[in-house]
């Protein structure tokens, strides 16, 4: 065990933020392999699609798709259009610009096509090339993937979710006895291609083998075999062995001799005695079971032939036709049952040998023979005809059409494609050896499938499991888009063919033939509206990562929710290490949408693989291999937690292992593989839950899902009790910025970091990296994306170091919530049923405050009555309402806005109405404007109040630019200019430093003005000359001179690159924007809203412990600890036992210990600071170092000892609040570890403390569990849900108020509420609810008028929905009328009808 611990410490040291803060990891298991990048799935797949790299053997690619459609030939064969190659040009706008302008991030695609024109000789029909033309054709834009694995489509980030579908190949299955009443198993086989017709083979209730093509009407399978070119005898010989029966002794009654095969007789119980044909002895008596041992012994004893009675020949089947050559008389046909008449005929002809099929009804059944007899077809033509009739009913078949149809179904690469995957699966299942380039079916494949199916019926082998991950594969972005693009290209091909036949081919160019619209439309449709192209969940970095790693079984070509049964949704043993058994949505999609496990990756065939360590001769090596579910089947896999000795052998004799889906205790020498890590089982979200092993699965599921809904807070704080995965997620999600190469920090401010690269810069590369930070950007979910620098000027960074924190990250670690002090106790019913009681301190100190950014936009369009105008000059609006607007009518940045405030003034012309003379006069006096326009300004909707953080103005090209737009443009150009200048400065500095080193000590063979030739160049000489002149030196050393010239050309190239980039961006800014048709100007206003925690907000821990805030209590009333610290949150202890998520209690205790240890570090640091006011001249902080070593233990001793004083102080000051711990999933702190930490922190090892009531000051009756829990604030905020309505929109038909906040709707008074009022007998309230408060149109207007006047009487009329009912009845021909009866009149039934 010791060896493991050291390894882990080394690993911990090697990884990132340990510089600023060490997370104390409790895990014992050393991980041999690094976790693959978390968004590799997306990037890898799209990279394969976009650039089919020539060096690597890619399976898919855009080029492959283009090659599969081209060459396109015209109908007459006089021309063909061929594909040469394609290239993607650089995109017009970068990702930021695309987001701002609302356009797609894509690269224009140029395809080089070659048009070959042939001349056809009329007589000989030979073709000769007449003309060849090549041309580059623009084929639309191809969306590009951003560095983080997303696409920007129309300005919004989208993710393409991978799809899980049935793998192409062959599947054998049975109906589980459900079809037939007897419960007998009907076996079936299905060949699934990647595209093309499905081929199904199935047994029916009469045990006949049938075939279906594309799920159409079934045919006997022999019809298909005939069509493949076999005759009945070949069919029988393929499926059955033959046995030669010879007459014994030639006399009629003596019986028949057959060779003795021990396998055939094992376990059988013949009704007759088995006699040795040679000796005549009885070997096995009648009606006795023959054991395998006895059968083998008989063979050893020399038994060669058996003698069987003549009756045994009857009811067996002939293997071939027996015909009298001379007369042509048929004695017996192949497949016929042998009867006494046949024997007589054969005896008469003197034939004493019979070839019979080896069908014994036990090991081999007569299924194919029976099918042959049922089949009406008897030769190839009839077989083809039968297939044609099923596929094209109603059309008369000719031999040619039938043959062409059959060929096209399975043997034509254009229409049928198994894909490499399908071929590999077919080969594996049926033991074939075709190359994986053979992607159509072959005759052998079909025969092998039928043979395997018949074998299953005979009890040989097993059926496949559809839910095994070996039979399901993943289609990622690249492949999905490839399929879509292919569809588009095929549509385009049709158009091109028609075009080629309608124009004169000799005069046209490829450009005239190609119309790329269908291909572009297919791509656009896929990204815009496919079920798998989803709006990215950007709530926090974890939700982004999870969304990209999601695998869905839904979508085109997948399952639907309604049809998916239990089996598909269930966890399967092959999910281990591939798909997370925990993380899946609750609700109708459960089990259909999954997440990849942490170490999983998708191989080139689309199967999910997971890594294992190789075990050789009982010794665990450090070699790691990735295996798919199929490859893993034959192995015995030990768990990652199995104990090992120093040299890697297993400590125990028997080891807990898995084999083919079963858990067993295996002897250590039989183990062949070992897990690489305990967390390879779970997904990213689940691996972030500490003490996951102590939580119930259902709650762990909720915990994983709710972490994805945590809102980024104003001040992020990493969890004190984590799992060590936090850093990986922050880094791979792209939320935290990492340095692309090592260097020295040159400049830092809030919006950018400039790093000067160290070491030799490759030619053509810039020697400086500028990282632009995102400031207060809006995410897809309206949360705030804000990045903060972590580095200081002069600091040295290495490639991969975190240099800036993003949303929900703290020092490069994921930080979704806050560490809060929690007590588990009831408090006056305020935490009944999962409610949460919180302290006012949390609100006051902005602990759970988050910023949300809302976007509002307004467009000025060109209307029929004239253009709309964005202006400050709005009719009937006072100066007070315009206080926040500038001259252009757009709100200032920094303005505080409230509901109803104008964000952007806009006026729209309204139709001319005829004017009265008075109006005309007023108009003449007071000017035009006022009456012919109406106010359509953008106002802040109710429920939103905040600060304007950004305004963007977009103008159509050619429209005059207003001042505000000009100001925004100038600001942006200044920023670009600054970037450009900084890059130039650093380039100059680096170049001249290199040049100085090269020139010093050299002899000048040429020199700038004022310097003599032949001088030796030294420091003083160089200092006296302007740096720009240095390049004029030439030196005598030729070698050095070449180097100097190389530096010069490199410098010129880099400088030109910097200038070009600046000019290009500036030009883009000054160019007009591409707006939707009819839009002249668009303004976007971003308002930042601060959301404090308030009652009704939802909070949760990481263990599925969720609740809603019920009350915010003043600090002084909260229960407090002995040292006077009030707790932050009071949770209900009853939420733990029934839910069985005990992990939260472990977390509470360990978190409390972390807080206590942090306190100790803080005290040591404060003592040192008090003794050393001047840290530079002070003593080394030995006491602080000792405290740190005590807190962290032996494992981190070397790390802490190796740090400088300044680093020790920085480390300690980051730990004063609490010491971060890491308890990896399934390998974390045990109960003993938690107790030890509590004791080290000086806390009672029970983890319980005496609490005092804040209101009375008395101690509570018994000790209470108090500790630190990491709480998250979830995206379900009460502000987004609550709203109020007085009068609002009504539904058109029923005239009832709409529902929901988005529609500004009302509260539904439903059936149950009506029953409640009925039960109370509240007749008038009920009448009011159902009439004037709902859909009595006249009544509700009257009520409104009455209320305005201060009156409170009203009269209920007929609800509109009653009128709708009446009209519906009339539409059915039932006339219903309401007529009022005078008092005293009764209708026929004696019922009084009230007056209308």
UniProtKB/Swiss-Prot annotation:
UniProt EC number: 2.7.7.6
Membrane-spanning intervals of the chain: none
Gene3D superfamilies on file: 2.40.50.100, 2.40.50.150, 3.90.1100.10, DNA-directed RNA polymerase, beta subunit, external 1 domain, DNA-directed RNA polymerase, subunit 2, domain 6, RNA polymerase alpha subunit dimerisation domain, RNA polymerase Rpb2, domain 2
Listed PROSITE patterns: RNA_POL_BETA
Cited InterPro entries: DNA-dir_RNA_pol_bsu_ext_1_sf (IPR042107), DNA-dir_RNA_pol_bsu_external_1 (IPR019462), DNA-dir_RNA_pol_su2 (IPR015712), DNA-dir_RNAP_su2_dom (IPR007120), DNA-dir_RNAP_su2_hyb_sf (IPR037033), RNA_pol_bsu_bac (IPR010243), RNA_pol_bsu_CS (IPR007121), RNA_pol_bsu_protrusion (IPR007644)
Claim: Transferase is one of the keywords in the record: yes
GO biological process: DNA-templated transcription
Pfam families reported in the protein's UniProt record: RNA_pol_Rpb2_1, RNA_pol_Rpb2_2, RNA_pol_Rpb2_3, RNA_pol_Rpb2_45, RNA_pol_Rpb2_6, RNA_pol_Rpb2_7
Superkingdom of this protein's organism: Bacteria
GO MF terms, alphabetically ordered: DNA binding; DNA-directed RNA polymerase activity; ribonucleoside binding
One Gene Ontology term, aspect cellular component: DNA-directed RNA polymerase complex
Alphabetical UniProt keywords: DNA-directed RNA polymerase, Nucleotidyltransferase, Transcription, Transferase
Catalytic reactions on record: RNA(n) + a ribonucleoside 5'-triphosphate = RNA(n+1) + diphosphate
NCBIfam families named in the record: PRK00405.1, rpoB
Function: DNA-dependent RNA polymerase catalyzes the transcription of DNA into RNA using the four ribonucleoside triphosphates as substrates.
PANTHER family: DNA-DIRECTED RNA POLYMERASE I SUBUNIT 2
Protein family according to the UniProt entry: Belongs to the RNA polymerase beta chain family.
Subunit structure, as described in the record: The RNAP catalytic core consists of 2 alpha, 1 beta, 1 beta' and 1 omega subunit. When a sigma factor is associated with the core the holoenzyme is formed, which can initiate transcription.
Protein name (Swiss-Prot/TrEMBL): DNA-directed RNA polymerase subunit beta
Protein species of origin: Erythrobacter litoralis (strain HTCC2594)
Name of the gene this protein is made from: rpoB
